[in-house]
Protein backbone atom coordinates (compact mmCIF):
# COMPACT_ATOMS: atom_id res chain seq x y z
CA UNK A 1 0.00 0.00 0.00
CA UNK A 2 1.28 3.55 -0.70
CA UNK A 3 2.76 5.57 2.16
CA UNK A 4 2.36 9.35 2.33
CA UNK A 5 4.42 11.88 4.31
CA UNK A 6 3.85 15.36 5.59
CA UNK A 7 6.38 17.93 4.43
CA UNK A 8 6.79 19.18 8.00
CA UNK A 9 7.97 15.79 9.29
CA UNK A 10 11.62 15.47 10.30
CA UNK A 11 13.69 13.03 8.15
CA UNK A 12 14.22 10.57 11.02
CA UNK A 13 10.47 10.63 11.76
CA UNK A 14 9.83 9.87 8.09
CA UNK A 15 12.30 6.97 8.24
CA UNK A 16 10.71 5.62 11.43
CA UNK A 17 7.17 5.91 10.07
CA UNK A 18 8.07 4.18 6.82
CA UNK A 19 9.89 1.38 8.66
CA UNK A 20 6.88 0.89 10.95
CA UNK A 21 4.65 0.65 7.87
CA UNK A 22 6.92 -1.97 6.27
CA UNK A 23 6.98 -4.02 9.50
CA UNK A 24 3.18 -3.85 9.71
CA UNK A 25 2.80 -4.93 6.08
CA UNK A 26 5.16 -7.90 6.61
CA UNK A 27 3.13 -9.00 9.66
CA UNK A 28 6.18 -9.51 11.87
CA UNK A 29 6.58 -8.57 15.53
CA UNK A 30 9.22 -6.12 16.77
CA UNK A 31 10.67 -8.88 18.95
CA UNK A 32 10.99 -11.32 16.04
CA UNK A 33 12.55 -8.69 13.77
CA UNK A 34 15.04 -7.64 16.45
CA UNK A 35 16.11 -11.27 16.87
CA UNK A 36 16.49 -11.72 13.10
CA UNK A 37 18.63 -8.57 12.89
CA UNK A 38 20.67 -9.45 15.99
CA UNK A 39 19.87 -6.19 17.78
CA UNK A 40 18.33 -5.21 21.10
CA UNK A 41 14.51 -5.03 21.00
CA UNK A 42 14.39 -1.86 23.12
CA UNK A 43 16.88 -0.17 20.77
CA UNK A 44 14.72 -1.07 17.76
CA UNK A 45 11.63 0.28 19.55
CA UNK A 46 13.41 3.62 20.09
CA UNK A 47 14.42 3.80 16.41
CA UNK A 48 10.81 3.16 15.41
CA UNK A 49 9.70 6.00 17.71
CA UNK A 50 12.33 8.33 16.25
CA UNK A 51 14.13 8.55 19.59
CA UNK A 52 17.39 7.01 18.35
CA UNK A 53 19.47 7.58 15.23
CA UNK A 54 19.90 4.72 12.80
CA UNK A 55 23.49 3.59 13.52
CA UNK A 56 24.73 2.97 9.97
CA UNK A 57 23.90 2.08 6.40
CA UNK A 58 24.63 -1.55 7.33
CA UNK A 59 21.67 -1.44 9.70
CA UNK A 60 19.39 -0.38 6.83
CA UNK A 61 20.85 -3.09 4.58
CA UNK A 62 20.32 -5.74 7.26
CA UNK A 63 16.78 -4.79 8.19
CA UNK A 64 15.82 -4.56 4.49
CA UNK A 65 17.18 -8.07 3.99
CA UNK A 66 15.31 -9.49 7.01
CA UNK A 67 12.06 -7.84 5.90
CA UNK A 68 12.65 -9.07 2.33
CA UNK A 69 11.89 -5.61 0.97
CA UNK A 70 11.56 -5.05 -2.75
CA UNK A 71 14.27 -3.03 -4.49
CA UNK A 72 11.92 -0.04 -4.67
CA UNK A 73 10.99 -0.22 -0.97
CA UNK A 74 14.61 -0.63 0.11
CA UNK A 75 15.63 2.32 -2.08
CA UNK A 76 13.00 4.56 -0.43
CA UNK A 77 14.10 3.49 3.07
CA UNK A 78 17.75 4.11 2.17
CA UNK A 79 16.86 7.52 0.76
CA UNK A 80 15.22 8.58 4.02
CA UNK A 81 18.23 7.29 5.96
CA UNK A 82 20.56 9.37 3.78
CA UNK A 83 18.35 12.43 4.21
CA UNK A 84 18.47 11.98 7.98
CA UNK A 85 22.28 11.79 7.83
CA UNK A 86 22.99 14.66 5.43
CA UNK A 87 19.97 16.90 5.77
CA UNK A 88 17.39 17.23 3.00
CA UNK A 89 18.99 20.18 1.17
CA UNK A 90 22.44 18.58 1.04
CA UNK A 91 21.00 15.20 0.02
CA UNK A 92 18.93 16.71 -2.79
CA UNK A 93 21.87 18.79 -4.03
CA UNK A 94 24.17 15.75 -4.17
CA UNK A 95 21.47 13.73 -5.89
CA UNK A 96 21.05 16.54 -8.41
CA UNK A 97 24.80 16.66 -9.16
CA UNK A 98 24.85 12.88 -9.60
CA UNK A 99 22.04 13.10 -12.17
CA UNK A 100 23.81 15.91 -14.04
CA UNK A 101 26.97 13.78 -14.28
CA UNK A 102 24.97 10.79 -15.52
CA UNK A 103 23.17 12.88 -18.14
CA UNK A 104 26.41 14.53 -19.34
CA UNK A 105 28.04 11.10 -19.67
CA UNK A 106 25.20 10.02 -21.96
CA UNK A 107 25.09 13.18 -24.09
CA UNK A 108 25.43 12.40 -27.78
CA UNK A 109 28.56 14.15 -29.06
CA UNK A 110 27.98 12.98 -32.65
CA UNK A 111 26.82 15.34 -35.37
CA UNK A 112 22.99 15.62 -35.50
CA UNK A 113 21.02 15.00 -38.65
CA UNK A 114 20.84 17.87 -41.11
CA UNK A 115 17.80 20.12 -40.98
CA UNK A 116 14.96 18.95 -43.18
CA UNK A 117 13.06 22.23 -43.49
CA UNK A 118 13.70 25.31 -45.60
CA UNK A 119 15.86 27.93 -43.84
CA UNK A 120 16.08 30.46 -46.69
CA UNK A 121 13.69 33.33 -46.08
CA UNK A 122 12.86 36.32 -48.26
CA UNK A 123 13.48 39.03 -45.66
CA UNK A 124 11.35 41.60 -47.49
CA UNK A 125 8.34 39.28 -47.30
CA UNK A 126 8.45 39.19 -43.49
CA UNK A 127 6.09 41.76 -41.88
CA UNK A 128 7.72 44.55 -39.89
CA UNK A 129 5.77 43.44 -36.82
CA UNK A 130 4.44 39.90 -36.30
CA UNK A 131 2.43 39.07 -33.18
CA UNK A 132 2.04 35.43 -32.14
CA UNK A 133 -0.43 34.10 -29.58
CA UNK A 134 -0.17 30.47 -30.68
CA UNK A 135 2.78 28.56 -29.20
CA UNK A 136 3.33 26.28 -32.20
CA UNK A 137 3.29 29.15 -34.68
CA UNK A 138 5.65 31.23 -32.56
CA UNK A 139 8.17 28.43 -32.06
CA UNK A 140 8.10 27.42 -35.73
CA UNK A 141 8.78 30.99 -36.86
CA UNK A 142 11.51 31.49 -34.26
CA UNK A 143 13.32 28.49 -35.67
CA UNK A 144 12.85 29.44 -39.32
CA UNK A 145 13.80 33.12 -38.99
CA UNK A 146 16.76 32.65 -36.63
CA UNK A 147 18.15 29.78 -38.73
CA UNK A 148 17.77 31.87 -41.87
CA UNK A 149 19.71 34.80 -40.40
CA UNK A 150 22.44 32.53 -39.00
CA UNK A 151 22.71 30.81 -42.38
CA UNK A 152 23.50 34.25 -43.81
CA UNK A 153 26.23 34.95 -41.25
CA UNK A 154 24.34 36.50 -38.34
CA UNK A 155 25.38 36.06 -34.72
CA UNK A 156 22.73 35.54 -32.03
CA UNK A 157 22.30 37.64 -28.90
CA UNK A 158 20.04 36.20 -26.20
CA UNK A 159 18.72 37.40 -22.85
CA UNK A 160 16.69 34.51 -21.45
CA UNK A 161 16.87 31.82 -18.79
CA UNK A 162 18.29 28.51 -20.06
CA UNK A 163 15.55 25.98 -20.85
CA UNK A 164 15.31 22.81 -22.89
CA UNK A 165 13.45 24.58 -25.69
CA UNK A 166 15.98 27.42 -25.90
CA UNK A 167 18.91 24.98 -25.90
CA UNK A 168 17.36 22.96 -28.73
CA UNK A 169 16.53 26.11 -30.71
CA UNK A 170 20.06 27.51 -30.44
CA UNK A 171 21.64 24.11 -31.13
CA UNK A 172 19.68 23.77 -34.37
CA UNK A 173 20.36 27.37 -35.40
CA UNK A 174 24.10 27.19 -34.73
CA UNK A 175 24.71 23.74 -36.20
CA UNK A 176 27.48 23.87 -38.79
CA UNK A 177 27.85 27.64 -38.56
CA UNK A 178 30.64 29.90 -37.33
CA UNK A 179 28.16 32.22 -35.65
CA UNK A 180 28.71 33.37 -32.09
CA UNK A 181 25.93 32.98 -29.53
CA UNK A 182 26.11 35.50 -26.69
CA UNK A 183 23.74 34.34 -23.95
CA UNK A 184 22.93 36.44 -20.86
CA UNK A 185 21.00 34.96 -17.93
CA UNK A 186 20.90 35.05 -14.14
CA UNK A 187 22.00 32.65 -11.43
CA UNK A 188 20.07 32.59 -8.19
CA UNK A 189 21.51 34.20 -5.07
CA UNK A 190 18.27 34.49 -3.11
CA UNK A 191 19.14 35.78 0.34
CA UNK A 192 18.15 33.52 3.21
CA UNK A 193 17.62 30.40 1.11
CA UNK A 194 19.31 27.26 2.43
CA UNK A 195 19.99 25.78 -0.97
CA UNK A 196 20.65 28.58 -3.45
CA UNK A 197 22.51 26.15 -5.73
CA UNK A 198 19.34 24.24 -6.63
CA UNK A 199 18.09 26.59 -9.35
CA UNK A 200 21.62 27.07 -10.68
CA UNK A 201 22.08 23.30 -10.94
CA UNK A 202 18.65 23.04 -12.61
CA UNK A 203 19.70 25.26 -15.52
CA UNK A 204 23.36 24.20 -15.72
CA UNK A 205 22.75 21.09 -17.92
CA UNK A 206 21.10 23.23 -20.62
CA UNK A 207 24.10 25.57 -20.66
CA UNK A 208 26.62 22.75 -20.63
CA UNK A 209 24.88 20.82 -23.42
CA UNK A 210 24.95 23.81 -25.75
CA UNK A 211 28.56 24.68 -24.85
CA UNK A 212 29.67 21.13 -25.68
CA UNK A 213 27.94 21.30 -29.05
CA UNK A 214 29.04 24.77 -30.14
CA UNK A 215 32.50 26.23 -29.49
CA UNK A 216 31.28 29.77 -30.07
CA UNK A 217 28.59 29.66 -27.41
CA UNK A 218 29.48 32.36 -24.87
CA UNK A 219 27.56 32.32 -21.59
CA UNK A 220 27.42 35.34 -19.26
CA UNK A 221 25.64 35.53 -15.93
CA UNK A 222 24.53 37.99 -13.30
CA UNK A 223 22.94 37.34 -9.92
CA UNK A 224 19.25 37.75 -9.20
CA UNK A 225 16.74 36.34 -6.74
CA UNK A 226 14.96 33.57 -8.65
CA UNK A 227 11.74 33.85 -6.66
CA UNK A 228 11.63 37.63 -7.16
CA UNK A 229 12.27 37.25 -10.90
CA UNK A 230 9.57 34.66 -11.54
CA UNK A 231 7.04 36.48 -9.35
CA UNK A 232 7.65 39.81 -11.08
CA UNK A 233 5.32 41.40 -13.61
CA UNK A 234 8.05 41.59 -16.26
CA UNK A 235 6.30 41.35 -19.65
CA UNK A 236 8.03 39.46 -22.46
CA UNK A 237 11.35 38.90 -20.60
CA UNK A 238 13.01 36.82 -23.33
CA UNK A 239 14.99 38.79 -25.93
CA UNK A 240 16.74 37.47 -29.05
CA UNK A 241 18.56 39.62 -31.58
CA UNK A 242 19.93 38.70 -35.02
CA UNK A 243 21.04 40.89 -37.92
CA UNK A 244 17.47 41.38 -39.14
CA UNK A 245 15.18 40.51 -36.25
CA UNK A 246 14.38 41.59 -32.72
CA UNK A 247 12.36 38.95 -30.91
CA UNK A 248 10.57 39.28 -27.57
CA UNK A 249 8.62 36.42 -25.99
CA UNK A 250 7.13 35.40 -22.69
CA UNK A 251 9.17 33.11 -20.44
CA UNK A 252 7.58 29.92 -21.87
CA UNK A 253 7.81 30.83 -25.58
CA UNK A 254 4.03 30.66 -25.91
CA UNK A 255 3.44 34.24 -27.08
CA UNK A 256 5.72 36.83 -28.59
CA UNK A 257 6.47 39.62 -31.03
CA UNK A 258 8.98 39.55 -33.91
CA UNK A 259 10.18 42.87 -35.31
CA UNK A 260 11.86 43.20 -38.70
CA UNK A 261 13.27 46.64 -38.05
CA UNK A 262 16.88 47.80 -38.35
CA UNK A 263 16.40 50.72 -35.92
CA UNK A 264 14.89 48.36 -33.33
CA UNK A 265 17.69 45.80 -33.84
CA UNK A 266 20.39 48.48 -33.52
CA UNK A 267 18.80 50.04 -30.42
CA UNK A 268 18.47 46.70 -28.62
CA UNK A 269 22.00 45.70 -29.64
CA UNK A 270 23.36 48.79 -27.89
CA UNK A 271 21.34 47.96 -24.77
CA UNK A 272 22.49 44.34 -24.95
CA UNK A 273 26.15 45.36 -25.05
CA UNK A 274 25.66 47.66 -22.04
CA UNK A 275 24.01 44.86 -20.08
CA UNK A 276 26.71 42.39 -21.09
CA UNK A 277 29.42 44.55 -19.46
CA UNK A 278 27.67 44.05 -16.11
CA UNK A 279 27.74 40.25 -16.43
CA UNK A 280 30.48 37.74 -15.65
CA UNK A 281 31.71 35.12 -18.09
CA UNK A 282 30.57 31.65 -17.02
CA UNK A 283 32.83 29.37 -19.00
CA UNK A 284 35.91 29.13 -21.18
CA UNK A 285 36.31 26.79 -24.12
CA UNK A 286 39.53 25.04 -25.01
CA UNK A 287 39.63 24.37 -28.73
CA UNK A 288 42.56 21.95 -28.68
CA UNK A 289 44.68 19.77 -26.39
CA UNK A 290 47.19 22.58 -25.76
CA UNK A 291 44.57 24.92 -24.32
CA UNK A 292 43.10 22.10 -22.27
CA UNK A 293 46.46 21.20 -20.76
CA UNK A 294 46.82 24.88 -19.88
CA UNK A 295 43.41 24.81 -18.15
CA UNK A 296 44.21 21.61 -16.32
CA UNK A 297 47.52 22.59 -14.76
CA UNK A 298 46.76 26.26 -14.27
CA UNK A 299 44.81 25.80 -11.02
CA UNK A 300 46.90 26.04 -7.87
CA UNK A 301 44.62 24.05 -5.54
CA UNK A 302 43.61 20.60 -4.31
CA UNK A 303 42.30 18.57 -7.21
CA UNK A 304 39.87 15.70 -7.90
CA UNK A 305 39.74 13.98 -11.29
CA UNK A 306 37.12 11.45 -12.42
CA UNK A 307 37.54 9.44 -15.62
CA UNK A 308 37.09 5.97 -17.09
CA UNK A 309 40.86 5.38 -16.99
CA UNK A 310 43.38 6.34 -14.30
CA UNK A 311 45.29 9.55 -14.98
CA UNK A 312 48.38 8.43 -16.88
CA UNK A 313 49.70 11.85 -17.90
CA UNK A 314 51.48 12.24 -14.55
CA UNK A 315 53.13 8.84 -15.07
CA UNK A 316 54.79 9.65 -18.39
CA UNK A 317 58.58 9.55 -18.33
CA UNK A 318 60.42 11.92 -20.64
CA UNK A 319 61.52 9.02 -22.85
CA UNK A 320 57.97 7.65 -23.19
CA UNK A 321 56.57 11.11 -23.87
CA UNK A 322 59.19 11.91 -26.53
CA UNK A 323 58.67 8.54 -28.21
CA UNK A 324 54.89 8.77 -28.53
CA UNK A 325 53.71 12.42 -28.62
CA UNK A 326 52.60 13.38 -32.14
CA UNK A 327 52.82 17.14 -31.76
CA UNK A 328 54.81 19.94 -33.42
CA UNK A 329 58.07 20.73 -31.62
CA UNK A 330 56.80 23.91 -29.92
CA UNK A 331 53.58 22.22 -28.79
CA UNK A 332 55.52 19.22 -27.54
CA UNK A 333 57.71 21.53 -25.45
CA UNK A 334 54.69 23.40 -24.05
CA UNK A 335 52.85 20.25 -22.96
CA UNK A 336 56.02 18.84 -21.40
CA UNK A 337 56.48 22.02 -19.35
CA UNK A 338 52.89 21.88 -18.14
CA UNK A 339 53.23 18.20 -17.19
CA UNK A 340 56.33 19.08 -15.18
CA UNK A 341 54.34 21.78 -13.37
CA UNK A 342 51.59 19.25 -12.69
CA UNK A 343 54.01 16.77 -11.15
CA UNK A 344 55.57 19.50 -9.03
CA UNK A 345 52.13 20.54 -7.76
CA UNK A 346 51.67 17.05 -6.29
CA UNK A 347 54.13 17.95 -3.53
CA UNK A 348 52.05 20.99 -2.54
CA UNK A 349 48.42 19.98 -3.08
CA UNK A 350 46.26 16.91 -2.75
CA UNK A 351 45.36 15.05 -5.97
CA UNK A 352 42.65 12.37 -5.96
CA UNK A 353 41.97 10.40 -9.15
CA UNK A 354 38.80 8.30 -9.37
CA UNK A 355 38.53 5.72 -12.16
CA UNK A 356 37.13 2.29 -13.04
CA UNK A 357 39.01 -0.99 -12.99
CA UNK A 358 37.68 -1.63 -16.52
CA UNK A 359 39.50 1.53 -17.62
CA UNK A 360 42.72 0.37 -15.96
CA UNK A 361 42.44 -3.03 -17.65
CA UNK A 362 41.82 -1.42 -21.05
CA UNK A 363 44.87 0.83 -20.71
CA UNK A 364 47.12 -2.07 -19.69
CA UNK A 365 45.79 -4.21 -22.56
CA UNK A 366 45.84 -1.67 -25.40
CA UNK A 367 47.91 1.34 -24.30
CA UNK A 368 45.18 3.74 -25.39
CA UNK A 369 45.15 6.96 -23.31
CA UNK A 370 41.65 8.42 -23.12
CA UNK A 371 42.99 11.76 -21.85
CA UNK A 372 44.37 12.51 -25.33
CA UNK A 373 42.79 12.63 -28.81
CA UNK A 374 43.85 9.59 -30.82
CA UNK A 375 45.68 11.67 -33.42
CA UNK A 376 48.01 13.25 -30.81
CA UNK A 377 50.04 10.18 -29.77
CA UNK A 378 50.98 6.57 -30.51
CA UNK A 379 50.20 3.84 -27.98
CA UNK A 380 52.92 3.02 -25.41
CA UNK A 381 54.30 -0.53 -25.51
CA UNK A 382 53.43 -3.10 -22.84
CA UNK A 383 56.82 -2.60 -21.18
CA UNK A 384 56.26 1.18 -21.14
CA UNK A 385 52.74 0.73 -19.73
CA UNK A 386 54.16 -1.31 -16.85
CA UNK A 387 56.69 1.45 -16.13
CA UNK A 388 53.83 3.96 -16.03
CA UNK A 389 51.83 1.70 -13.70
CA UNK A 390 54.83 1.36 -11.37
CA UNK A 391 55.09 5.17 -11.25
CA UNK A 392 51.36 5.33 -10.46
CA UNK A 393 51.79 2.88 -7.56
CA UNK A 394 54.81 4.82 -6.31
CA UNK A 395 52.82 8.08 -6.33
CA UNK A 396 50.15 6.36 -4.22
CA UNK A 397 52.57 4.81 -1.75
CA UNK A 398 54.52 8.05 -1.29
CA UNK A 399 51.35 10.05 -0.67
CA UNK A 400 51.93 12.20 -3.77
CA UNK A 401 48.59 11.16 -5.30
CA UNK A 402 45.55 9.18 -4.24
CA UNK A 403 44.41 6.87 -7.05
CA UNK A 404 41.04 5.28 -6.14
CA UNK A 405 38.96 2.72 -8.03
CA UNK A 406 35.20 3.27 -8.29
CA UNK A 407 33.14 0.14 -7.77
CA UNK A 408 31.05 -0.46 -10.89
CA UNK A 409 28.03 -1.56 -8.85
CA UNK A 410 27.71 1.97 -7.45
CA UNK A 411 28.65 4.32 -10.26
CA UNK A 412 29.00 3.60 -13.97
CA UNK A 413 32.03 5.58 -15.18
CA UNK A 414 31.66 6.67 -18.81
CA UNK A 415 34.33 6.63 -21.51
CA UNK A 416 32.76 9.80 -22.89
CA UNK A 417 33.21 12.05 -19.88
CA UNK A 418 36.06 13.32 -17.72
CA UNK A 419 35.54 15.74 -14.83
CA UNK A 420 38.36 17.57 -13.06
CA UNK A 421 37.54 19.89 -10.19
CA UNK A 422 39.78 22.16 -8.15
CA UNK A 423 38.96 22.97 -4.56
CA UNK A 424 36.33 25.76 -4.82
CA UNK A 425 38.21 27.17 -7.83
CA UNK A 426 37.07 25.65 -11.12
CA UNK A 427 35.19 22.78 -12.73
CA UNK A 428 36.74 21.32 -15.90
CA UNK A 429 34.58 19.11 -18.11
CA UNK A 430 35.82 17.02 -21.03
CA UNK A 431 33.28 15.38 -23.33
CA UNK A 432 34.47 12.92 -25.99
CA UNK A 433 32.73 11.56 -29.04
CA UNK A 434 32.56 7.81 -29.59
CA UNK A 435 35.60 7.80 -31.88
CA UNK A 436 37.76 9.80 -29.42
CA UNK A 437 38.66 12.11 -32.29
CA UNK A 438 36.72 15.15 -31.11
CA UNK A 439 36.86 16.53 -27.57
CA UNK A 440 34.93 19.36 -25.94
CA UNK A 441 36.81 21.16 -23.14
CA UNK A 442 35.00 23.49 -20.74
CA UNK A 443 36.18 25.38 -17.67
CA UNK A 444 33.55 26.78 -15.27
CA UNK A 445 34.36 29.02 -12.30
CA UNK A 446 30.96 30.08 -10.90
CA UNK A 447 31.07 29.54 -7.14
CA UNK A 448 27.76 27.75 -6.47
CA UNK A 449 28.38 25.19 -9.25
CA UNK A 450 32.00 24.52 -8.28
CA UNK A 451 31.13 24.13 -4.60
CA UNK A 452 28.23 21.77 -5.38
CA UNK A 453 30.44 19.47 -7.49
CA UNK A 454 33.34 19.65 -5.00
CA UNK A 455 31.04 18.73 -2.10
CA UNK A 456 29.55 15.85 -4.09
CA UNK A 457 32.91 14.28 -4.91
CA UNK A 458 34.28 14.85 -1.41
CA UNK A 459 31.31 12.87 -0.09
CA UNK A 460 31.57 10.29 -2.88
CA UNK A 461 35.24 9.54 -2.10
CA UNK A 462 34.36 8.64 1.48
CA UNK A 463 31.42 6.42 0.50
CA UNK A 464 31.20 2.66 -0.06
CA UNK A 465 31.21 3.35 -3.81
CA UNK A 466 35.00 3.82 -3.84
CA UNK A 467 37.77 1.35 -2.98
CA UNK A 468 40.10 2.36 -0.18
CA UNK A 469 43.62 3.64 -0.83
CA UNK A 470 45.06 0.24 0.16
CA UNK A 471 42.53 -1.77 -1.88
CA UNK A 472 43.31 0.31 -4.97
CA UNK A 473 47.08 -0.21 -4.64
CA UNK A 474 46.51 -3.96 -4.35
CA UNK A 475 44.44 -3.96 -7.55
CA UNK A 476 47.04 -1.82 -9.36
CA UNK A 477 49.78 -4.30 -8.41
CA UNK A 478 47.76 -7.17 -9.84
CA UNK A 479 48.18 -5.66 -13.35
CA UNK A 480 52.00 -5.60 -13.28
Named regions from a protein language model:
Residues 101-132, 136:
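The feature captures two recurrent sequence modes
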Residues 57-61, 65-115:
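Short amphipathic recognition helices of helix-turn-helix/homeodomain-type DNA-binding modules
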Residues 2-29, 36:
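A short, Lys/Arg-rich alpha-helix, primarily the initiator
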Amino acid sequence: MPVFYRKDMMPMSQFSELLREYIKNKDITIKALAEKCGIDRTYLHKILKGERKVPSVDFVENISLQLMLSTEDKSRLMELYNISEMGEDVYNRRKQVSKIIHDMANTNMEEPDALTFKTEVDIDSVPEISIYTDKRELRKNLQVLICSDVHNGSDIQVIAQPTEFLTNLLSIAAEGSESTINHLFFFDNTSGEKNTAKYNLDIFPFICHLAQKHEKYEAFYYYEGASAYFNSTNIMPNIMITNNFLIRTDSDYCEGVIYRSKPMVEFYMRQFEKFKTKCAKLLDHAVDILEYVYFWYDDNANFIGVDFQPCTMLCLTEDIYNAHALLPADAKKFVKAKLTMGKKALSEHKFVNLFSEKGLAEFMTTGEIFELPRNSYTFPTLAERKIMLQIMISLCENGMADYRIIKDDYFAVSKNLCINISDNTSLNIVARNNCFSDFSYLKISETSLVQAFWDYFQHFIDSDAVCSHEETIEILRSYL
